[in-house]
């Protein structure tokens, strides 16, 4: 039996680490010698748009909202959108998926397969033009999470909705088309390959050991402590063992929860605290970096997934994919997750 080690101390300049969920190998290339402080950006290059012409700052005259919150309370409206909104959900003007009454598949030349991209695309917009989520209060972040959950519960009832993706692109390098902070919700009629693989591996582990692999990892991380950057009663935020990028953070519930849409009020508050801590640390430690965060949760296709465990991934844009990453499909991180976590732990929430 292989000897277990509580601590991960790299002595060889590079190390391959296995992601237990995806079964992907990642490279921790510490031989490149980057210290945590090196990742901090001195000047952030962003496209500036004045609030006077920002479409989200002038939303009252443009969009038909699906959901409006004002200072923690859901509000109704008639005709005109009230000016005191703080978080709002609107349809995306440029959707990749469109609602349709039919879901059709076609085969071209007994070779290529197509289907119509049936679905819904929405934007979750916060009020302040210049405040990223890292600068919002815990209360304001909870309002965003309230919006995620409420829209999820509504969209999962729609026809041809089998998966709901919730994500946030912050900054130019992360693909944000508008500097005004906003998240996106997109529904799809199918389940992507990566999620199918995660579901398959999670189920196999559950069948073999009668335990959730995510719960097992959380227990190990709580004991080891070296990769933990924040912890409260309900949530754990870590730099994962097989980080796909420098300063990657995963936030997951300590309890076994397969379905994000079933999150309770208490859990939403705990998740808001974890998000605030993680995003604030990245903001301070990396100099307001561009980043993506996204939800991993069980599909809403009517099947049961008791072995899955929802979680959020935050990926700062600390490096770009080059030829090796694209060709070998293997990410390289130039800092140990343990050192990244140690650096972030020292920073305030």
Question: Where would I find each of the regions flagged by the language model?
Answer:
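HIT superfamily nucleotide-processing domains
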Residues: 1-349
């Amino acid at each position: 039996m292989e000897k277990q080690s509580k601590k991960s101390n790299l002595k060889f300049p590079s190390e391959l680490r296995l992601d237990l969920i995806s079964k992907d190998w990642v490279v921790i290339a510490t031989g490149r010698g980057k210290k945590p402080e090196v990742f901090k950006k001195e000047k952030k290059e962003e496209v500036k748009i004045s609030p006077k012409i920002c479409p989200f700052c002038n939303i009252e005259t443009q969009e038909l909202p699906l959901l409006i919150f004002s200072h923690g309370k859901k509000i109704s409206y008639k005709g005109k959108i009230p000016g005191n909104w703080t978080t709002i959900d609107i349809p995306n003007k440029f959707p990749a998926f469109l609602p349709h009454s039919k879901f059709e598949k076609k085969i071209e030349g007994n070779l290529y397969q197509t289907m119509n991209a049936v679905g819904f695309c929405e934007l979750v917009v916060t009020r302040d033009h210049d405040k990223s989520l890292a600068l919002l209060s815990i209360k304001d972040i909870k309002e965003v999470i309230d919006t995620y959950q409420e829209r999820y519960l509504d969209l999962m009832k729609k026809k041809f909705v089998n998966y709901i993706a919730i994500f946030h692109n912050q900054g130019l390098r992360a693909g944000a088309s508008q500097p005004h902070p906003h998240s996106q919700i997109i529904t799809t009629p199918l389940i992507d390959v990566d999620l199918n693989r995660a579901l398959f591996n999670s189920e196999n582990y559950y069948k073999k050991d009668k335990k959730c692999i995510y719960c097992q990892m959380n227990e190990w991380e709580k004991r080891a402590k070296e990769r933990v950057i924040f912890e409260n009663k309900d949530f754990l935020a870590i730099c994962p063992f097989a980080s796909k990028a420098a300063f990657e953070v995963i936030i997951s519930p300590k309890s076994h929860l397969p379905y994000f849409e079933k999150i309770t009020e208490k859990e939403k508050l705990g998740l808001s605290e974890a998000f605030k801590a993680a995003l604030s640390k990245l903001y301070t430690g990396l100099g307001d970096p561009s980043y993506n965060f996204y939800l991993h949760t069980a599909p809403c296709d009517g099947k049961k997934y008791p072995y899955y465990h929802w979680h959020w991934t935050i990926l700062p844009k600390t490096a770009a994919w080059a030829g090796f990453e694209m060709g070998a499909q293997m990410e390289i991180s130039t800092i140990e997750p343990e050192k990244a976590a140690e650096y972030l732990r020292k920073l305030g929430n």
